[in-house]
Amino acid sequence: MEHRIATYLGGDAMLTALGSDTQESFRALAEGRCGLHPVGRPCPLEAAGSFAPGLLEALALEGLTPLESALVHCAERAVRESHLDPGGDECALVISTTKGNVSLLEGRTTPPDEAFLYTSACRVARRLGITRPPVVVSNACISGVTALIVARRMILDGECAHVIVAGGDLLSEFVAEGFRSFKSLSPGPCRPYDATPEHGLSLGEAVAAVVLTSDPARAKLPAVRLEGGAVTDDANHISGPSRTGDGLHYAIEGALREAALPRERLSFVNAHGTGTAYNDAMESRALEPVSYTHLTLPTTSRV
């Protein structure tokens, strides 16, 4: 019988607008608390999720940007929880971010290469003591899930036994004004899949890390395995998704196929749910083909 390597979730950590660790953030989510509020930095936003005042300053590390310091903080906590030596030959680092240190480019006082995503990833890797070159995944809103898929495949291919996946983005004027130019910002808390005419998303900042490992002894209990994933491209346009939903449907089917999981076993969907008309319509189409209509799925969305 062929031995199939399993990929387990190890230690984790997160910083969100709802809390400074995984338990606090999940507890706030379960209680229905909202992390959105008016913010003045880095530019005025009517409803955004920002860290508690002073959090980034408290985590600051010499020689690192606020984002890099937060990534190191979360990665170190995840590593400790997994009882892992990040400096070993069997440990790799995958960094997931959409814009990274883009705020360094404001005012043009910083050399452009300081804002390169790989430059940032190398600084994080050095601080963690990781000897292998880091991998950077930057793929817009699917950066996080793509990084997990990449990390899992690194383990399955025998490149390493453990991967630290760390990701995050901070609020920035560049991102806020970019979405504002598309008229994609909600005037209040976003309402995914809602029929109201005031469509839009709510920006936020968060940083998190998780260890993926082939060693069940390092798995967080109760043990959770990452069984399958898929990435597709709808070949539409950088400013919006294809309205057919085909790309997302193929990704769902690919993930189920890789996991050898029948559709009937699905019990939860964590949808993107941006609150924008084109995206929400596309996702609704992708989740409503004939093969899914018999399922009643609890669904959450994240922006």
Say what each PLM segment does.
Residues 2, 85-87, 117, 128-130, ...:
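Solvent-exposed alpha-helices and their adjacent loops that cap or buttress functional pockets
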Residues 9, 92-94, 161-165, 190, ...:
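Short glycine-aspartate micro-motif
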Residues 23-24, 106-116, 124, 154-157, ...:
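A glycine- and small-aliphatic-rich helix-loop capping segment at beta-alpha/alpha-beta transitions
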Residues 56-76, 109-114, 134-146, 194-208, ...:
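Active-site pocket-shaping loop/turn-to-helix segments
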Residues 75, 128, 135-167, 202-220, ...:
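Active-site-proximal alpha-helical scaffold in enzymes
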Residues 293-299:
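Conserved small/polar residues in nucleotide/adenosyl-binding loops
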Residues 4-16, 22-48, 189-259, 268:
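Condensing-enzyme catalytic core mediating Claisen C-C bond formation in acyl metabolism
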Residues 9, 33-138, 169-173, 263-281, ...:
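Conserved beta-ketoacyl condensing-enzyme motif
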